[in-house]
Regions:
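Conserved beta-strand hairpin/beta-sheet module of binuclear metal-dependent hydrolase folds
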Residues: 1-41, 114-126, 131
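Core dinuclear metal-dependent hydrolase active-site scaffold
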Residues: 11, 90-118, 122
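Divalent metal-coordination and catalytic microenvironments
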Residues: 12, 24, 53, 87, ...
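Active-site neighborhood of phospho(di)ester-bond hydrolases with catalytic His/Asp-centered motifs
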Residues: 23-26, 45-55, 74-77, 104-107, ...
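Active-site environment of divalent metal-dependent phosphoester hydrolases
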Residues: 29-30, 54-60, 80-81, 110-112, ...
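Active-site metal-binding motif and surrounding structural segment of the metallo-beta-lactamase
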Residues: 29-74
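Divalent-metal (often Zn2+) His-rich catalytic cores of metallo-beta-lactamase-fold enzymes
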Residues: 145-204, 208-211
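C-terminal regulatory/interaction regions
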Residues: 199-249
Length: 249
């Protein structure tokens, strides 16, 4: 799994507060977990662990980390929770005076969530929006229609100035949320048009027959993503499969 510079784990708390929320503890890497604990501090408390989605580079250490700090893990998917509290669109998490609003942003995965921190005008996007480059729509769990809707929702929040910055799951902080979301929306539409163009020579029946062929998505990747490092073609193929499913729905 590609993680750019590694997984960003976010430790959120109000200034002067002891109690914090930890978002996406990440993989069970000793140095990574030690860095999180150093930020929490020896006199700090963890009120909850929140997960943006289930991919292991965000979630694998969550339960063990939470048990060590005596708190729960809240996630959309029950399989990744620790304790009885779930997490879903519209929920508000409050810890130590900090308010976090949950936004459902499916698409990268079916369980993807983003977390709005009103006090900072920032949104934690997990893998829905990255700090560098664009993300993969992880078909079949991820779905392009849902992803486009999620981008539109985030874009609306940026347009109304509810969010100014994006704190992503990988890569650097984005100071200008609106510009990046503009790019993400236009990029997805451009790629979709490129896939559509690659298929326009096929009739509907021929398309449906060839969609089942395992070589078609890779053939499209080689045309549409010819400007992308072949190392990334595996991830690109997942997005192409999502685009094909979107086009023939």
């Amino acid at each position: 799994m590609m993680t750019l510079d590694g997984t960003n784990t976010w430790v959120l708390r109000e200034p002067g507060a002891r109690r914090c929320v930890v978002v996406d503890p990440g993989p069970p890497d000793a140095s990574h977990l030690a860095a999180i604990e150093a930020v929490v501090g020896t006199d700090g408390e963890v009120g909850a662990v929140l997960l943006t989605h289930h991919h292991f580079d965000h979630s694998e250490s969550a339960k063990e980390f939470a048990q060590r700090w005596g708190c729960g893990v809240r996630a959309l998917d029950p399989e990744y929770r620790l304790g009885s509290e779930g997490l879903g669109d519209g929920d508000v998490v409050e810890t130590g005076g900090l308010e976090i609003r949950v936004i459902g942003t499916p698409g990268h995965t079916s369980d993807s969530l983003s977390f709005l921190v009103p006090a900072d005008g920032a949104v934690l996007t997990g893998d829905t929006v990255l700090g560098r480059g664009t993300t993969v729509v992880a078909h079949p769990d991820g779905e392009l229609g849902a992803y486009l809707d999620s981008l539109d929702r985030l874009h609306q929040l940026a347009t109304t100035h509810e969010i100014a910055a994006i704190w992503p799951g990988h890569g650097p902080v984005i100071a200008d949320a609106l510009s990046v979301l503009d790019y993400y929306v236009s990029h997805r539409q451009q790629r979709l048009e490129q896939v559509r163009a690659a298929l326009e020579v096929l009739s509907s029946q021929e398309l449906r027959e060839r969609i089942a062929a395992e070589d078609l998505p890779r053939q499209i990747v080689e045309v549409v993503y010819s400007d992308v490092d072949p190392v990334l073609w595996g991830a690109a193929e997942l997005s192409v499969r999502a685009q094909l499913a979107y086009l023939i729905r």
